[in-house]
Design a protein with these regions (language model features):
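N-terminal targeting/regulatory segments, especially signal peptides of secretory
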Residues: 1-269
Length: 273
């Protein structure tokens, strides 16, 4: 995580807010909205197309030919976790049942031309689809559970967006740091989270990025520390690329958008390419 990554999320939050309107709907993406160019045929006429536009923008912004990580994609692959957490939160605003992420992947990402954009530097990944699939274990977490990581992620990202090379005084981030640690603590004390190896990896990514933020500050002595006793195995000092298990099942290419209204339960087949 860095300032540029979080500014990209801020760009999305400003034009496509992460909460519903007063009428309980997603915000519109109009012609003047930069995300409109990421909509298929320049038309985001459904809620899921709006979410897909934001998702594709973030993937392209980070890993595209002129993206944030164009020269070091491998060492920053964990940014994909944050994009998927954003996706989970946006889907969870209306559908809180099961694992809708799996169906979203099948319909909007897998075998879609725009996700075939090539990338370099990540072993086993030739395009965006491969990169996302490398984190496929996250899509097997129920959407309700995965979206719980969104609040601490956003607090941390807001800290990074304030901080920069021209502003290493982190006193303005203290309240956000307290907010992050409080939300992180809630997750680390949730047995359903800590008993899940995939969730533990996300906790590690968050805690490492928080600790890395503190190291960059001129004075972070007043920042609260993170207690990690419940995380197993122990988090590595640096976030690293995690290998995804390759589980082979058939994916139907005939899914329609309507399929997404039905949550995927734990009894459904695992995600595969």
């Amino acid at each position: 995580m860095n300032k540029e990554v979080c500014e990209s999320f801020l760009n999305v939050w400003e034009v496509f807010p992460d909460k519903l309107t007063k009428n309980n709907g997603y915000h519109e993406i109009n012609d003047g909205n930069f995300l409109n160019s990421y909509c298929g045929s320049y038309s985001c006429d459904t809620d899921l197309k709006k979410i897909d536009a934001g998702f594709f923008y973030l993937v392209n912004k980070f890993f595209g030919a002129s993206g944030v990580f164009k020269n070091n994609a491998k060492s920053n692959i964990n940014a994909v976790e944050y994009i998927i957490i954003w996706l989970s939160h946006m889907l969870n605003l209306k559908d809180k049942q099961g694992n809708i992420l799996t169906n979203f992947y099948k319909v909007y990402i897998n075998n879609q031309d725009k996700y075939k954009n090539t990338i370099n530097g990540v072993e086993g990944c030739s395009n965006y689809d491969d990169l996302i699939y490398k984190k496929n274990e996250l899509m097997k977490i129920t959407n309700e559970k995965l979206s719980k990581f969104y609040a601490p992620f956003k607090s941390l990202c807001e800290m990074y967006s304030i901080f920069g090379d021209d502003n290493k005084n982190c006193t303005k981030c203290l309240e956000k740091a307290k907010e992050f640690v409080e939300k992180y603590k809630e997750l680390s004390e949730d047995y359903s989270i800590t008993n899940d190896s995939s969730c533990n990896k996300i906790l590690c990514t968050l805690s490492n990025d928080y600790d890395n933020f503190k190291k960059k500050c001129k004075d972070s002595s007043s920042f609260p520390t993170i207690d990690k006793p419940n995380i197993t195995p122990k988090c590595p000092e640096q976030t690293s690329e995690q290998n995804s298990k390759q589980i082979h099942v058939n994916i139907s290419t005939k899914n329609s958008e309507q399929n997404l209204s039905y949550a995927v339960t734990s009894e459904d087949a695992p995600l595969s390419k």
